[in-house]
Amino acid sequence: MISVHTRLKVIDNSGGKEIMCIRVLGTNRKYATLGDVIIGVVKNAVPNMPVKKSDVVRAVVVRIKKTINRKNFFSVRFDDNAAVIIGSDGNPKGTRIFGPVARELRDKNFSKIASLAQEVV
């Protein structure tokens, strides 16, 4: 579960390396889980890229460390907390996504992110 001040790894090629969550979007929500949109500030960035350090961006949570229990009695857990930076229209800013992402993104209408990913778990 992602709360305020949690740092997440950015797994696309938009230019950010790490973001810190400053707000979970929704009505009075404390935690974000897979497929939730957060607002974050870029803490580390690659030089000469569109996303700069200290930019305020929207991102979708695509991996969390907490165990996810699915309805088919499987449970999935990732090694890190990761996000993909998106624009105001909901499409990713990067053109590539590195590493696996969760299947729950398709259910939450982020099929563009799921189709760009190397692996959907």
Curated annotation (Swiss-Prot):
Pfam families for this protein: Ribosomal_L14 (PF00238)
GO biological process, one term: translation
Location within or outside the cell: Plastid, Chloroplast
Coiled coil: none
InterPro entries xrefs: Ribosomal_uL14, Ribosomal_uL14_bac-type, Ribosomal_uL14_sf
GO molecular function, one term: large ribosomal subunit rRNA binding
Task performed by this protein: Binds to 23S rRNA.
Name the record gives this protein: Large ribosomal subunit protein uL14c
